[in-house]
Regions:
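N-terminal secretory/membrane targeting signals
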Residues: 1-25
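Donor nucleotide-activated moiety binding/catalytic core segment of transferases
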Residues: 129, 294-337
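Catalytic binding pocket for nucleotide-activated donors in carbohydrate/polymer assembly enzymes
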Residues: 214, 334-410
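C-terminal alpha-helical cap of glycosyltransferases
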Residues: 415-432
Length: 432
């Protein structure tokens, strides 16, 4: 490991020299293209580094006649689909390292931030993509495998359940019960690390209906809330949240994408009405909207950009907009509960009937969690009452943060310290 670290340092230093001492090109590069090129360079550098790392270990193995493996005796593994789920895994990874528990971390994303961590207790590997990658994950032999990925073992998902893993554990990454999961996607898991005790009822109902072997259910909370709360506490201490009570109220408009967006169902006329009433609106589209429906997003921006109170936010980190706003307008998006629980601010849910629950466990349970619960974090409106949006905005702003906090305490256990409880459970499971 010492020689590998020296090798890494030389590669990084050499790369620095190449880019630091170059002649002036007198060329212009727009920020968007520049950002894309930098991301490409970093991704390529990561891929090259991990390739060279594997070559280094292979050479050492040939020279010494010994096979180098960090994975031989590990009792815990983590499987990640990539950087989009790092917020869930980061607190768990940090807690495992703090407790000096060695573990394997497999990812199918070369941009996964976990690959940048160099620690003696964490043995991370980019396994590639496609069938060979999933075959590698399927060959894991650790007694415990932690993942927030559902569907493992299902016919429609390429990853079979690892045959040598004794306890396949699913950790929740949103506030919901099993009604919000696709049919059968948790059938092959042994352990459910849930957000709270109340989730067990829905899991048991599904198990009885499909005659499944009962899972071990462990209420641990949401690990990504550990990170969100930590970031929020830091921002609060830095800024003291100096919102002027006499200034215009700010509304964060955070719709879902595609046909499930409130802007598709309710239209966009209400935005004009809210702005003309003197409110500020921060329009923050779903990240997927920026990929697949940018024309629609641009039309919304074009329609309202002349209004002084209208702004557009596409920063990957939503913290600034969430802190600046006084309430949120959304639809069925799970971000409603993140916003309400972290910032203790109310939400106006522009609801609508669903025709997609046939694919979810909700079809067995008779309801989709989050519909009526949205009334406990603010106001819930139906399309036939769309003319009442402005009135509902005013009512939502009167909603008490104390009521939201009380609901959070009923729904979410171990608020801000979920990862500690997850690792405590792991320690109890792996001890001799």
């Amino acid at each position: 490991m010492k020689y590998l670290n020296i090798f890494k340092s030389k590669v990084i230093f050499s790369s620095f020299l190449i880019f630091a001492f170059t002649k002036d090109a007198y060329a212009y590069l727009d920020p968007g293209s520049g950002n894309a090129i930098i991301c490409l360079i970093l991704s390529l550098a990561g891929a090259v580094l991990y390739y060279l790392k594997s070559v280094f270990y292979r050479i050492i193995s040939i020279v010494t006649g010994k096979k180098i493996s960090h994975e031989k005796n590990e009792k815990v593994s983590i499987f990640s689909e990539g950087k989009n789920y790092w917020l869930t895994y980061k607190p768990i990874v940090e807690e495992l390292i703090a407790c000096k528990i060695s573990f394997i971390y497999y990812t199918i994303d070369i941009d996964d931030p976990a690959l940048l961590i160099d620690n003696e207790y964490m043995h991370s590997r980019y396994v590639g993509t496609g069938d060979r990658a999933f075959a590698k994950v399927g060959s894991l032999k650790t007694p415990i495998m932690i993942t927030t990925t559902p569907n493992i073992g299902c016919p429609t998902y390429p990853l079979r359940r690892p045959g040598k893993v004794k306890k396949l554990c699913h950790v929740w990454h949103s506030i919901c019960d099993s009604s919000c999961y696709h049919l059968g996607c948790l059938d092959h898991y042994d352990v459910a690390l849930t957000v709270g005790t109340w989730v067990e009822d829905s899991l048991r109902q599904v198990e009885r209906i499909r005659k499944l072997t009962p899972k071990t259910v462990v209420p641990v909370g949401l690990p990504y809330f550990d990170e969100l709360k930590k970031n929020y506490d830091l921002r609060i201490s830095d800024s003291a949240q100096k919102n002027d009570k006499n200034s215009a109220k700010t509304i964060l408009l955070a719709p879902s994408w595609g046909t499930k967006s409130c802007l598709r169902v309710y239209g966009t006329d209400f935005i004009k009405e809210v702005l003309e009433e003197g409110y500020n609106i921060i329009y923050r589209p779903h990240p997927q909207s920026l990929k697949v429906e940018m024309d629609f997003v641009n039309n919304v921006i074009s329609d309202f950009k002349e209004y002084k109170g209208f702004s557009f936010d596409h920063d990957p980190d939503a913290t600034e907009s969430m802190m600046k706003s006084d309430m949120m307008i959304s639809d069925k998006s799970g971000v409603r509960f993140d916003y309400a629980f972290i910032y203790e601010k109310p939400v106006l849910s522009l609801d609508f009937s669903t025709d997609f629950i046939d694919a979810y466990e909700a079809i067995l349970l008779g309801r989709l969690w989050g519909d009526t619960e949205s009334e406990l974090i603010g106001i819930r409106l139906q399309p036939e009452n769309r003319n009442m949006i402005m009135e509902s905005v005013k009512k939502t702003l009167q909603y008490s943060g104390k009521e939201i906090k009380n609901f959070r305490e009923k729904v979410l256990c171990n608020y801000g310290c979920s990862s500690e409880h997850i690792v405590d459970w792991i320690k109890n499971e792996i001890q001799p």
